[in-house]
């Protein structure tokens, strides 16, 4: 075992092979060795900083797609509250709250196959207002996208678009049959051609093999994806995943290490399922990942911001703000929310 570990992690920097990725997931390499090497790469590109992302579910339900993992899919009978797209003012106020909560990036998510022209223009207007008035980094996840719509969003100031591959091409037909894997990769191609940074990741635990997880990690590398959210499957009411995988905290950390070592300079983000699957190893996972979500997910609650910040600091890391500065020590206190610290917020909204 030691010889195997030394062979895999002897060079710095190193991009591991598919075979080596499988050895990480299969437990051949000691977890501490995986973490040590993953942290070397994480620290090389991101130092001791952690980026907190906050999601805003701007439209819930009314989705014609049949993604088996999703509570919003058609005919899900999941009991989620459906609502149409929020107004620009509602989304803006959510962005204000995200900035107050120390978000590095504000992530807008809408259900559906993809936006039409009118919806794209509405989203563009909202994005431009948030970036201009709040000076925030924004990510949008709105489904399938062509190059023309991507260019509209780019001109509005969008610098990141999320469209997850979710799993390998080989496994994709097992989780969705209303659109293809090719359509997803074509969306990434449109985003790239428009000059928008690509955010694309996975949901592990949907009955895929270790080979599937390794394959999609390399697929994301081939697209040069700069932000990779790693979700751990949550069996929400109404899902149709036939054989969900058993995810232990150790395996989840190994998966994050593998993604880091295949995509060393990408932002690796701990996404949905952190609280339930990583559990006591949530802080340990930050030695591989440099980003996470806080304050909940689309239809599932998550850790609140103060708890998240405390975990980050307890592990020896520091939360990074969108302007590159570090979240002040007085975060969460009245003095932190002063007009001196947030002049742009007081300019547009009285607190």
UniProtKB/Swiss-Prot annotation:
Pfam families: BATS, Radical_SAM. One of its GO terms (biological process) is biotin biosynthetic process. It comes from the Bacteria. Keywords: 2Fe-2S, 4Fe-4S, Biotin biosynthesis, Iron, Iron-sulfur, Metal-binding, S-adenosyl-L-methionine, Transferase. It catalyses: (4R,5S)-dethiobiotin + (sulfur carrier)-SH + 2 reduced [2Fe-2S]-[ferredoxin] + 2 S-adenosyl-L-methionine = (sulfur carrier)-H + biotin + 2 5'-deoxyadenosine + 2 L-methionine + 2 oxidized [2Fe-2S]-[ferredoxin]. SUPFAM superfamilies: Radical SAM enzymes. Residues 48-265 form the Radical SAM core domain. InterPro entries: Aldolase_TIM, BATS_dom, Biotin_synth/BioAB, Biotin_synthase, Elp3/MiaA/NifB-like_rSAM, rSAM. The keyword 4Fe-4S applies. One of its GO terms (molecular function) is biotin synthase activity. Binds 1 [4Fe-4S] cluster. The cluster is coordinated with 3 cysteines and an exchangeable S-adenosyl-L-methionine. Binds 1 [2Fe-2S] cluster. The cluster is coordinated with 3 cysteines and 1 arginine. Its cofactor is [4Fe-4S] cluster; [2Fe-2S] cluster. PANTHER family: BIOTIN SYNTHASE, BIOTIN SYNTHASE, MITOCHONDRIAL. Homodimer. Belongs to the radical SAM superfamily. Biotin synthase family. This is Biotin synthase.
């Amino acid at each position: 075992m030691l010889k195997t570990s030394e062979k895999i992690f002897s060079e710095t920097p190193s991009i591991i092979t598919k075979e080596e990725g499988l050895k990480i997931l299969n437990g051949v390499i000691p977890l501490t060795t995986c973490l040590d090497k993953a942290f070397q790469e994480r620290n090389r590109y991101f130092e001791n900083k952690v980026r907190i992302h906050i999601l805003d579910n701007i439209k819930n339900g009314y989705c014609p797609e049949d993604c088996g993992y999703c509570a919003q899919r058609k005919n899900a009978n999941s009991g989620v509250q459906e609502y149409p797209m929020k107004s620009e003012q509602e989304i803006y106020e959510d962005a204000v709250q995200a900035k107050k909560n120390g978000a590095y990036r504000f992530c807008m998510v809408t259900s559906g196959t993809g936006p039409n022209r009118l919806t794209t223009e509405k989203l563009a207007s909202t994005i431009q207002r948030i970036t201009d008035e709040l000076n925030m980094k924004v990510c949008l996840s709105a489904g399938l996208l062509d190059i023309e719509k991507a260019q509209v969003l780019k001109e509005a100031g969008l610098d990141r678009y999320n469209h997850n591959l979710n799993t390998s091409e080989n496994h994709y037909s097992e989780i969705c049959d209303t659109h293809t894997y090719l359509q997803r990769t074509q969306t990434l191609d449109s985003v790239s051609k428009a000059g928008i940074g690509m955010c694309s990741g996975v949901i592990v635990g949907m009955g895929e093999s270790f080979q599937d997880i390794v394959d999609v990690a390399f697929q994301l590398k081939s697209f040069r994806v700069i932000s990779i959210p790693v979700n751990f499957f949550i069996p929400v009411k109404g899902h149709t995943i036939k054989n969900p995988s058993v995810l232990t905290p150790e395996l989840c950390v190994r998966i994050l290490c593998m993604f880091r070592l295949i995509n060393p300079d990408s932002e690796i983000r701990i996404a949905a399922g952190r609280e339930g699957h990583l559990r006591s190893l949530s802080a340990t996972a930050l030695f591989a990942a440099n980003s996470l979500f806080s304050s909940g997910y689309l239809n599932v609650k998550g850790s609140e911001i103060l708890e998240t910040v405390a975990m980050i600091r307890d592990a020896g890391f520091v939360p990074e703000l969108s302007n590159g500065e570090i979240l002040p020590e007085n975060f969460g206190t009245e003095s932190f929310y002063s007009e001196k610290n947030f002049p742009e917020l007081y300019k547009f909204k009285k607190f």
